[in-house]
Design a protein with these regions (language model features):
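AlphaC helix of the protein kinase catalytic domain
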Residues: 149-160
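AlphaC helix of the eukaryotic protein kinase fold
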Residues: 88-109
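Activation segment signature within eukaryotic-like protein kinase domains
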Residues: 168-169
């Protein structure tokens, strides 16, 4: 069985242990250590990382198994390990965001079927690769969603149809309605953060940038600047106050990129400060108008809530004009 070392600096993270092919041994073995760097491989005595799923500036995500469940269920282990060029204030901000993600997943994910559940959050202190020093690692463990994100779907299948976009809106807007009702704003909606499970349900992922609405006014002057370029609206990019409509804007940009096959910077006219996307997509005037309103630069002019967008989507289409004869 292959186990993956979660130490970011490990030069050879893959470890093969043939004795762990036996499930009984896997369940009772006290610990296994990386044969290259000595890092403990079984995390919190139960989570067994198998492979790297992805990594970014603040850490990495691993596919793992929980050996204390009857089926040794799959899960995702996220490691917080930011890049080494952060100053102490930036490092603390990054750590706070990681802890916030765990808090939000515990509060929201365990209550909503389209947000991953949180299973664990813990710290591990181990000897550093530098003699005489210690390293601290922070982990969270969450539900594994077996499927593809919308970015992967687009890469495989090409542009989305209007019917597919309507399905995305009808599935994700109720999730946002739930998130906003619990006092949070996601702040990082984009195709790669929406995952479709094998059963077809859409999940909202990556709550690392979430912000509590109740704390926005007090902290807006010192925004952390966490956003994805092109998907974030003006108020978020300028570090100003954010709203539920901030997420609606990002969801609309997500829809545009999937409809047109173009990146946000190819669709936004910076000279005239407007979105020019309609010539690249064939959609009904009704959907186009809804997306355009979600994309208005002023938060006050957009729909104020996910409820309002859902209501606009469910309204009957206007009746055709009646032609009268003189």
């Amino acid at each position: 069985m292959e186990l993956y070392c979660t130490r970011p600096a490990c030069p050879r993270p893959l470890n093969l242990f043939s004795d762990l092919d036996d499930p009984a041994t896997l369940k009772r073995v006290p610990q296994k250590y990386c044969t290259t760097c000595g890092m403990p491989l079984i995390l919190a005595d139960r989570y067994i990382p198998l492979k790297l799923l992805g990594q970014g500036g603040f850490g990495a995500a691993f596919l793992a198994r929980d050996r204390y469940t009857p089926t040794m269920r799959q899960c995702v282990v996220k490691l917080f390990q930011p890049s080494g060029n952060l100053n102490p204030q930036q490092l603390q901000t990054a750590q706070n965001l990681f802890e916030r993600e765990a808090e939000v997943l515990e509060e929201l994910g365990n209550q909503h079927p389209q947000i991953p559940d949180l299973f664990a959050f813990f710290q591990l202190t181990v000897p550093s690769l530098q003699p005489g020093k210690q390293e601290q690692f922070f982990y969270l463990v969450q539900e594994f969603i077996n499927g593809e994100n919308l970015e992967e779907e687009f890469t495989k299948n090409g542009k989305f149809s209007e019917a597919q976009i309507l399905e995305i809106l009808q599935q994700i807007l109720p999730v946002l309605q739930f998130v906003h009702a619990h006092g949070s704003i996601h702040r990082d909606i984009k195709p790669s953060n929406i995952m479709r499970s094998r059963k077809g349900a859409l999940f909202l992922l990556d709550f690392g940038a979430v912000k509590q609405v109740t704390k926005v006014a007090a902290s807006s002057a010192s925004s952390t600047g966490i956003y994805s370029m092109g998907y974030a609206p003006p108020e978020q990019m300028s570090g100003g106050q954010i709203y539920p409509s901030t997420d609606l804007y990002a969801l609309a940009v997500t829809c545009l990129t999937l409809l047109t096959g173009k990146q946000p910077n190819e669709l936004f006219d910076t000279y005239n400060n407007q979105w020019n996307w309609r010539t690249y997509a064939q959609v009904s005037p009704r959907l186009a108008n809804i997306l355009d309103r979600m994309l208005l630069s002023s938060p006050n002019q957009r729909y104020h809530s996910a409820d309002e967008v859902l209501a606009a989507l469910t309204l009957p289409p206007p009746a055709p004009p009646v032609q009268t004869t003189a």
